[in-house]
From Swiss-Prot:
Belongs to the Fmt family. It comes from Streptococcus pneumoniae (strain P1031). This is Methionyl-tRNA formyltransferase. (6S)-5,6,7,8-tetrahydrofolate binds at S110, L111, L112, P113. Keywords: Protein biosynthesis, Transferase.
């Protein structure tokens, strides 16, 4: 039985962890995840999905604010683990820790070398990729730069957003890891170096990147909106107030970018630099998320054709 330390944080990671727990070839000695955080307006302390899964399985849990140089790292190195599996952990692993293991692999939610970084699923959508995927790679000190052990792809559809793709890729990552790990541990797989000429980066989304620029095409804005749904959520401004857009569809239309072209009982069409967007799910300032019909029947009922979204 191979003894593992698992490191991860969000639901994606929890799915991978639960997969490992179903396989009796592995023993999880410890789980490392990010500390509990205060979430929302009420600052409710929330455990990570990985911590919740680990508690359900009765596993030892470590939550260092920073792994490097921590007492927790020293404890982990004394457990006698054969290797480390990480999946969206959110911290760099110190070389000292990596060097103490027989192996360390990462489950990364992109088709490396494309989309290294913390937001690969977001960027796959924002940049209009036709496919997404998961790469199992060896851990090195440089971010997502290790040799690739295996990859698996799935198509991206127009119905996908961050939430749906997150769920799909979590299952892909779980299955790919379970399919790959035995042969890798046995030495039957020769990892492949990444082509550095093809590297792209997908860093965490910055607040200023959430803002919609109506001078882009309808397809670009469509991709940005779904590439931020359900988080962090793209926004624009309407009458000076922040206006979030969760869902929209590209449609035909022509007008000044940001201009309202037509209003119906269940339809609000806004011009872009090329074509237009039909808004489907929105959140006006100070209001809950709602479908476009509810918006137009409520706070949006005073809107008129020709008004503008934007600054």
């Amino acid at each position: 039985m191979t003894k593992l330390i698992f490191m991860g944080t969000p639901d994606f990671s929890a799915t991978v962890l639960k997969g490992l727990l179903t396989d009796d070839r592995y023993e999880i000695l410890a789980v490392v995840t990010q500390p509990d955080r205060a979430v929302g307006r009420k600052k409710v302390i929330q455990e990570t999905p990985v911590k919740q899964a680990a508690k359900e399985a009765g596993l030892s849990i470590y939550q260092p604010e920073k792994l490097s140089g921590s007492p927790e790292m020293e404890e982990l190195m004394k457990l006698g683990a054969d290797g480390i599996v990480t999946a969206a952990f959110g911290q760099f692993l110190p070389s000292k820790l990596l060097d103490s293991m027989d192996f360390a692999v990462n489950v990364h939610a992109s088709l490396l070398p494309r989309h290294r970084g913390g937001a690969p699923i977001h960027y796959a959508l924002i940049q209009g990729d036709e496919e997404a995927g998961v790469t199992i790679m060896e851990m090195v000190k440089e971010m997502d730069a290790g040799d690739m052990i295996s990859r698996r792809s799935i198509p991206i559809t127009d119905e996908d957003n961050v939430g749906t793709l997150f769920e799909k890729l979590a299952l892909v990552g779980r299955d790919l890891l379970l399919d790959t790990l035995p042969a890798y541990i046995a030495g039957d797989i020769k990892p492949e170096p990444q082509d550095t000429s093809q590297v792209t980066f997908s860093p965490n989304i910055k607040p200023e990147e959430e803002k919609l620029d109506w001078n882009k095409t309808n397809r670009q804005l469509f991709n940005q909106i779904r590439g931020m749904n359900p988080w962090p959520v793209a926004h624009t401004f309407l009458k000076g107030d922040r206006f979030k857009i969760y869902e929209a569809l590209p449609v035909e239309g022509q007008g000044n970018p940001g201009e309202i072209l037509s209003i119906g009982k269940k339809e609000l069409i806004v011009a872009t630099a090329e074509g237009a967007l039909s808004l489907k799910q929105v959140q006006p300032a100070g209001k809950p998320k709602m479908d476009i019909a509810s918006f137009l029947n409520g706070v949006g009922r005073t809107l008129t054709v020709g008004e503008r979204f934007g600054d």
